[in-house]
Protein backbone atom coordinates (compact mmCIF):
# COMPACT_ATOMS: atom_id res chain seq x y z
CA UNK A 1 0.00 0.00 0.00
CA UNK A 2 1.36 3.40 -1.01
CA UNK A 3 1.51 5.41 2.21
CA UNK A 4 1.19 8.69 0.28
CA UNK A 5 -2.54 8.01 -0.05
CA UNK A 6 -3.05 8.98 3.60
CA UNK A 7 -3.46 12.75 3.51
CA UNK A 8 -4.44 15.46 5.97
CA UNK A 9 -8.20 15.15 5.35
CA UNK A 10 -8.74 11.87 3.53
CA UNK A 11 -7.28 8.86 1.76
CA UNK A 12 -6.74 9.70 -1.88
CA UNK A 13 -4.60 8.74 -4.87
CA UNK A 14 -4.47 7.87 -8.53
CA UNK A 15 -6.62 4.94 -9.67
CA UNK A 16 -5.51 2.17 -10.16
CA UNK A 17 -1.82 2.79 -9.37
CA UNK A 18 -2.31 4.01 -5.78
CA UNK A 19 -5.97 3.29 -5.03
CA UNK A 20 -7.49 0.07 -6.33
CA UNK A 21 -10.00 -2.57 -5.27
CA UNK A 22 -7.47 -4.35 -3.03
CA UNK A 23 -6.75 -1.09 -1.21
CA UNK A 24 -10.51 -0.45 -0.91
CA UNK A 25 -11.02 -3.89 0.63
CA UNK A 26 -8.16 -3.33 3.10
CA UNK A 27 -9.50 0.11 4.04
CA UNK A 28 -12.90 -1.54 4.58
CA UNK A 29 -11.47 -4.27 6.82
CA UNK A 30 -9.54 -1.69 8.78
CA UNK A 31 -12.42 0.78 9.09
CA UNK A 32 -14.90 -1.89 10.19
CA UNK A 33 -12.45 -3.15 12.81
CA UNK A 34 -11.41 0.34 13.89
CA UNK A 35 -14.93 1.60 14.55
CA UNK A 36 -15.70 -1.51 16.62
CA UNK A 37 -12.52 -1.46 18.69
CA UNK A 38 -11.99 2.27 19.09
CA UNK A 39 -15.52 3.70 18.84
CA UNK A 40 -17.76 0.84 19.97
CA UNK A 41 -19.79 1.11 16.75
CA UNK A 42 -21.07 -1.70 14.54
CA UNK A 43 -22.77 0.20 11.72
CA UNK A 44 -21.72 2.83 9.21
CA UNK A 45 -22.92 4.52 6.05
CA UNK A 46 -21.24 4.26 2.64
CA UNK A 47 -21.79 6.45 -0.40
CA UNK A 48 -19.99 6.84 -3.72
CA UNK A 49 -19.57 9.51 -6.35
CA UNK A 50 -19.91 9.20 -10.12
CA UNK A 51 -16.30 8.42 -11.01
CA UNK A 52 -15.95 5.35 -13.21
CA UNK A 53 -13.91 3.54 -10.54
CA UNK A 54 -16.29 4.30 -7.65
CA UNK A 55 -18.72 1.35 -8.05
CA UNK A 56 -16.00 -1.30 -7.86
CA UNK A 57 -14.17 0.51 -5.06
CA UNK A 58 -17.40 0.86 -3.05
CA UNK A 59 -18.20 -2.83 -3.58
CA UNK A 60 -14.83 -3.93 -2.18
CA UNK A 61 -14.94 -1.34 0.61
CA UNK A 62 -18.33 -2.65 1.72
CA UNK A 63 -17.12 -6.25 1.50
CA UNK A 64 -14.19 -5.38 3.75
CA UNK A 65 -16.38 -3.58 6.28
CA UNK A 66 -18.91 -6.41 6.49
CA UNK A 67 -16.19 -9.07 6.74
CA UNK A 68 -14.99 -7.25 9.86
CA UNK A 69 -18.43 -7.80 11.40
CA UNK A 70 -19.97 -4.37 10.83
CA UNK A 71 -23.26 -3.58 9.16
CA UNK A 72 -23.35 -1.12 6.27
CA UNK A 73 -26.09 1.18 5.06
CA UNK A 74 -25.34 1.67 1.37
CA UNK A 75 -26.49 5.05 0.03
CA UNK A 76 -25.40 4.25 -3.52
CA UNK A 77 -24.55 7.01 -5.98
CA UNK A 78 -24.81 10.32 -4.11
CA UNK A 79 -23.11 13.67 -3.77
CA UNK A 80 -21.06 14.23 -0.63
CA UNK A 81 -23.75 16.48 0.92
CA UNK A 82 -26.35 13.76 0.17
CA UNK A 83 -24.08 11.20 1.85
CA UNK A 84 -23.91 13.31 5.03
CA UNK A 85 -27.67 13.86 4.90
CA UNK A 86 -28.15 10.09 4.42
CA UNK A 87 -26.10 9.42 7.55
CA UNK A 88 -28.37 11.76 9.50
CA UNK A 89 -31.61 10.29 8.10
CA UNK A 90 -30.43 6.70 8.60
CA UNK A 91 -29.28 7.55 12.13
CA UNK A 92 -25.65 6.51 11.63
CA UNK A 93 -23.05 8.91 12.90
CA UNK A 94 -20.05 7.68 10.93
CA UNK A 95 -19.19 6.34 7.51
CA UNK A 96 -17.13 6.54 4.34
CA UNK A 97 -17.73 8.38 1.06
CA UNK A 98 -15.89 7.00 -1.98
CA UNK A 99 -14.72 10.16 -3.74
CA UNK A 100 -11.66 12.14 -4.72
CA UNK A 101 -13.62 15.37 -4.41
CA UNK A 102 -12.24 18.04 -6.74
CA UNK A 103 -9.21 16.01 -7.82
CA UNK A 104 -8.72 14.87 -11.44
CA UNK A 105 -11.01 12.15 -12.81
CA UNK A 106 -8.28 9.50 -12.64
CA UNK A 107 -8.01 9.89 -8.86
CA UNK A 108 -10.24 8.34 -6.26
CA UNK A 109 -10.28 7.84 -2.53
CA UNK A 110 -12.19 7.86 0.72
CA UNK A 111 -13.48 10.59 3.00
CA UNK A 112 -14.34 9.07 6.35
CA UNK A 113 -15.51 10.00 9.81
CA UNK A 114 -14.43 8.50 13.10
CA UNK A 115 -16.01 10.43 15.93
CA UNK A 116 -18.91 12.42 14.54
CA UNK A 117 -20.56 13.30 11.28
CA UNK A 118 -17.78 15.10 9.44
CA UNK A 119 -14.47 14.27 7.84
CA UNK A 120 -11.58 12.79 9.76
CA UNK A 121 -8.61 15.11 9.76
CA UNK A 122 -5.01 15.32 10.85
CA UNK A 123 -4.26 13.03 13.79
CA UNK A 124 -7.46 11.04 13.17
CA UNK A 125 -6.31 10.14 9.64
CA UNK A 126 -2.80 9.28 10.82
CA UNK A 127 -4.08 7.17 13.72
CA UNK A 128 -6.27 5.29 11.23
CA UNK A 129 -3.25 4.86 8.94
CA UNK A 130 -1.23 3.31 11.80
CA UNK A 131 -4.15 1.03 12.68
CA UNK A 132 -4.46 -0.03 9.03
CA UNK A 133 -0.76 -0.77 8.68
CA UNK A 134 -0.80 -2.93 11.84
CA UNK A 135 -3.28 -5.20 10.03
CA UNK A 136 -4.94 -6.70 13.11
CA UNK A 137 -8.47 -6.75 11.72
CA UNK A 138 -11.56 -8.31 13.26
CA UNK A 139 -13.59 -10.93 11.40
CA UNK A 140 -17.33 -11.34 11.25
CA UNK A 141 -20.40 -11.28 9.04
CA UNK A 142 -22.01 -7.88 8.77
CA UNK A 143 -25.13 -7.13 6.75
CA UNK A 144 -25.79 -4.58 4.02
CA UNK A 145 -28.99 -2.60 3.69
CA UNK A 146 -29.76 0.11 1.17
CA UNK A 147 -31.10 3.57 1.83
CA UNK A 148 -31.59 6.18 -0.88
CA UNK A 149 -31.35 9.66 0.67
CA UNK A 150 -31.84 11.60 -2.58
CA UNK A 151 -35.56 12.35 -2.31
CA UNK A 152 -35.23 13.30 1.37
CA UNK A 153 -32.32 15.58 0.51
CA UNK A 154 -34.21 17.25 -2.35
CA UNK A 155 -37.20 17.89 -0.08
CA UNK A 156 -34.89 19.33 2.58
CA UNK A 157 -33.28 21.69 0.06
CA UNK A 158 -36.64 22.72 -1.41
CA UNK A 159 -37.97 23.60 2.05
CA UNK A 160 -34.90 25.78 2.64
CA UNK A 161 -35.54 27.71 -0.58
CA UNK A 162 -39.22 28.16 0.23
CA UNK A 163 -38.37 29.52 3.67
CA UNK A 164 -35.73 31.80 2.15
CA UNK A 165 -38.27 33.14 -0.36
CA UNK A 166 -40.65 33.95 2.51
CA UNK A 167 -38.08 36.02 4.39
What are these regions (language model features)?
Residues 1-63, 67-68, 143-167:
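An N-terminal, well-structured beta->alpha segment
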Residues 39-116:
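Ferredoxin-reductase
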Residues 1-9, 105-107, 115, 139:
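Residue-level signal for pocket-adjacent positions within structured domains
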Residues 37-38, 75-78, 126-132:
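Short C-terminal domain-edge/linker segments immediately following a structured domain
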Residues 108-167:
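Gly/Ser/Thr-enriched, mixed-charge loops and adjacent short helices
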